[in-house]
């Protein structure tokens, strides 16, 4: 069964169906123009770029009296949302934790938009029990064995899966040896955006799995807390020798977060580190990283 989104972005296609139901002549002409080849660009600006909702379009064209069975053809079905699990089944049996950022943006015409799913989740009462359908799929970040050294890069909500990794390894450390983890986290402001601050600090101290005593490390970059922006790749450069040592020990690399520039910037940082520490040319460092990808030891999970 599909659910329709009256507050979702409507799909005004290049056909005149809506104009058939407009009783006001100027509205009919405008809708017919949108459906014409000449109106294609204006339709894009009005509809897709602004992500106007069904209700907003009907408010803009109040004379349109569409039968329900026609209206549903324009209303988008609700899409499934994909989230990385941010908990370990060893630490939280029968639970699944999610790390969700409330999506918000401003359109070119200064309309404030908020993500439907993330806003809905943020508005839930923590004490209220609700039932939702959930589907589990194999992700792009395989669960690592306890003796595999890890280099984790997770700015923003990209840290979500690595919270589960750290929880899992902390439980595994109680019953046997584990390999070290170093984690690079980044956000804009330490005061406002430092996700799971207490969790990371707890595990990076007192012989925790991220502590230097265990061969690990936790490094945070706060991009807007100083005049010069600092990102995860800058923190990686500061720890280039530690990264190189772990790579020489067979470490796997996991990268998660925004799919804009971050994954490519992180890859370039690894190239620079490998070239610097090994003395090899950048081309050789790039080939070595590609060999890690082919061997299943360089994983990226990115989203827009």
Segments from the language model and where they lie:
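FNR-like FAD-binding dehydrogenase module
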Residues: 1-304
């Amino acid at each position: 069964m599909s659910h329709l989104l009256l507050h979702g972005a409507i799909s005004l296609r290049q056909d005149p169906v809506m104009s058939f139901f407009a009783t006001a002549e100027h509205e009919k002409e405008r809708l017919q123009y949108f459906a014409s080849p000449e109106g294609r660009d204006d339709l894009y600006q009005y509809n897709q770029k602004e992500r106007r909702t069904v209700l907003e379009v009907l408010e803009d064209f109040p004379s349109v009296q569409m039968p329900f069975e026609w209206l549903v053809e324009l209303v988008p079905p609700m899409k499934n949302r994909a989230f990385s699990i941010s908990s370990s089944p060893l630490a939280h049996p029968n639970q699944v934790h999610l790390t969700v950022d409330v999506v918000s943006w401003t359109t070119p015409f200064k309309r404030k938009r908020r993500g439907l799913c993330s806003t809905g989740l943020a508005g839930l009462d923590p004490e209220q029990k609700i039932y939702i359908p959930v589907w589990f799929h194999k992700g792009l970040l395989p669960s690592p064995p306890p003796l595999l050294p890890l280099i984790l890069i997770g700015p923003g909500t990209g840290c979500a899966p690595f919270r589960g990794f750290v929880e899992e390894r902390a439980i595994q450390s109680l019953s046997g040896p584990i390999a070290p983890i170093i984690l690079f986290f980044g956000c804009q402001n330490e005061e406002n955006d430092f996700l799971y601050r207490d969790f990371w600090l707890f595990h990076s101290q007192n012989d925790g799995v991220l502590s230097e005593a265990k061969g690990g490390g936790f490094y945070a970059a706060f991009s807007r807390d100083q005049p010069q922006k600092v990102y995860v790749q800058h923190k990686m450069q500061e720890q280039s020798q530690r990264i190189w040592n772990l790579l020489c020990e067979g470490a796997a690399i996991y990268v998660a977060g925004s799919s804009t520039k971050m994954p490519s910037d992180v890859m370039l940082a690894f190239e620079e580190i490998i070239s610097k520490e090994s003395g090899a040319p950048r081309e050789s460092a790039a080939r070595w990283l590609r060999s890690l990808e082919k061997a299943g030891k360089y994983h990226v999970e990115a989203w827009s």
